């Protein structure tokens, strides 16, 4: 609940993560805020941002301003590997066919440790993990479908090569191992599955393998939402706060549509 009170427009070539601190400082300068709860999507999570938020909190306290800076930040999928142990530990005791929310800790290494420090600063942060079985099932099924289609294609080309080696003749140009490798590799790459299906481009014969350990790990990630937070709210409430961000994004889409109706795209003669 609440009403939007302000917005700012940043240069289009400015990375999203670099807008976080300036925006918070601007709000604190404009309004007598006592508590700030930052809820942001995956583009804003960085250890540097978390460290800077802690420094800003300390600076405000030194100035005598009693301002609480809290955050709920989503972990980008590309960084899920940093949380593999926490994911396995939390998911291991949970059902896969029911929604659940759990919490654990994440040890982050500060990138702003002074050069004189003998070891980088390690900070314990609260990590909330949520599982949506419906989303997990959709993603797993979609991936499995793509994998099976590629495997069928690979088996088809492998069968043609074996038949050619046995003396069978077919219409058109004969299929070569190098040609099959190149075509299959591009098919796998186009399906965004090169991290799962490995095509041996250096081998003389056409061959490929599936990384089953990686496949099981991706199935573990399916349907998961990872949130880093310093709030004291219950884990389920943290998840709900983050999901309310969708309402804000929906409002942005509506505003953008209204703006596009107006003649704002002018060109000079």
Question: Where in the sequence are the language-model features?
Answer:
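Anion-binding and metal-coordination hotspots
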Residues: 1-269
């Amino acid at each position: 609940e609440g009403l939007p009170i302000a917005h700012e427009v940043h240069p289009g070539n400015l990375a999203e993560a670099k807008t976080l601190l300036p925006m918070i400082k601007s709000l604190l300068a404009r309004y007598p805020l006592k508590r700030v709860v930052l809820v942001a999507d995956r583009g804003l999570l960085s250890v540097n941002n978390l460290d800077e938020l802690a420094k800003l909190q300390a600076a405000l306290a030194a100035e005598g301003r009693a301002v609480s800076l809290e955050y709920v930040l989503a972990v980008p999928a590309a960084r899920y590997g940093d949380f593999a142990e926490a994911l396995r530990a939390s998911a291991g005791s949970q059902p896969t066919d029911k929604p659940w929310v759990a919490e654990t800790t994440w040890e982050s290494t500060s990138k702003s440790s002074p050069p004189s420090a003998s070891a980088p600063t390690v900070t314990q942060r609260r990590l909330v993990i949520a599982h949506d079985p419906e989303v997990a099932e959709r993603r797993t099924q979609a991936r499995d479908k793509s994998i099976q289609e590629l495997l069928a294609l690979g088996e088809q080309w492998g069968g043609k090569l074996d038949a050619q080696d046995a003396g069978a003749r077919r219409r058109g140009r004969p299929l070569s191992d190098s040609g099959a490798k190149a075509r299959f590799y591009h098919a796998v790459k186009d399906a965004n599955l090169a991290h799962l299906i490995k095509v041996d481009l250096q081998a003389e014969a056409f061959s490929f393998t599936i990384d089953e350990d990686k496949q099981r790990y991706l199935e573990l990630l399916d349907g998961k939402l990872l949130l880093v937070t310093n709030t004291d709210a219950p884990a389920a409430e943290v998840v709900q706060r983050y999901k309310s961000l969708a309402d804000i994004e929906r409002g942005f889409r509506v505003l953008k549509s209204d703006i596009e109706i107006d003649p704002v795209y002018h060109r000079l003669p």
